[in-house]
Amino acid sequence: MNLERIIEEFHQGHSLNAYEVFGAHFVDGGVRFTVYAPHAENVWVVGSFTNWDENQILMERMNFQGVWTITVPYLNEWEVYKYKIQTRTGNILYKADPFAFYSETRPNTASKLVDLNKLTWTDDKWLQDRSLNFDKPMNIYELYVGGWKRNGEHPYSYDMLADELIPYIKENGYTHIELMPLSEYPFDGSWGYQVSGYYSLTSRYGNPQEFNRFVDRCHAAGIGIIIDMVPVHFVKDDFGLRYFDGEALYEYPNEYDANSEWGTMNFNLWNEEVRSFLMSSAAFWVN
C-alpha cells in the first residue's frame, strides 16, 4: 500500500481506495486511526480503551491539509471509539469515525473496531464466471432486510436470511438480490436511506463476518448481490458528518444548498475530498 499516494489521490478527488488509509486499521503494533479534519485545532481518540476522556489519546497532524493519525497499541476487536475534536472556536465535538467499518446499534452512536483482515471468501468460482454473465438476462429481487421476515420482534439475521431467502430466490427464478442500503443509519423508518456510516455495515442484522458469510452463500448458489447506495445526502445527527470539525466539510457551506428536502444534509460534490469519500465507499462495498 502506497499511503502517500492514496492520501494525495484523496485530496485530488479521484481516490477509489481511501478506506485503506482512513478509519481504524489493525496493523503491526496496534490499531492505526486516521481521520480527515482540516479545520480542527486538535483531535483525540477516545473510547472504551481510554475510559473515554480520562486517558484521551492526542492524534498527530499528518499533513497541512488536515489529515490526523495515531497508532494505538494493545487494542481488541469490538472496542468502541469516537474522535474528540477541538474546533477553531474552542468547542469540543464527539464524532463517529466517517470511515468506521462497524458501529454500535442505535440509539448508541460510537464506532467499533473490527478487523476486516479476518474476512475469508470462498467465491472464487463466482468471480471467475461473473464476466460470462454480462449478456444474460437478469431478474432482480429487491428487499429491505429489516422487513422481509421477522423472528418474533426482531428482523432476521444474515444467517437466517440466507437459510430462507436463497431457496426462495432459486425457486422463483431470480438471478440477483438487491439489498436496500446496508450502511449504518440511526432512524429505522428511513429504511437505510438516511445514512450515518458510509463504510459501516449496519449492526441491526449481524456483523461483517456474518454478512461475508451471507454473500458467500449467495454466490455459491449462483446468486448475485446488488447493494443500494445513497451518495446524495446524510443525516444531521450530531455524532455524524454534519459540521464534522466545527465547520462545513462534507456539506455545502451555505444553508440553502446544504439542507435537503428530506431533513438531511446534501453532500458538497464540488469538494475533492467528498468525491473521494463517496467513490471510495462505492468501491469498498464492491471489493
Show which residues each predicted segment covers.
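Glycine-rich, histidine-containing beta strand-loop boundary motifs that form or position
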Residues: 35, 47, 72, 85, ...
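Short, surface-exposed loop motifs enriched in S/T, G, D/E and P with embedded aromatic residues
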Residues: 54-63
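The feature marks proteins involved in alpha-glucan
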Residues: 1-32, 62-142, 147-155, 160
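Substrate-binding/active-site clefts of carbohydrate-active enzymes
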Residues: 125-137, 144-287
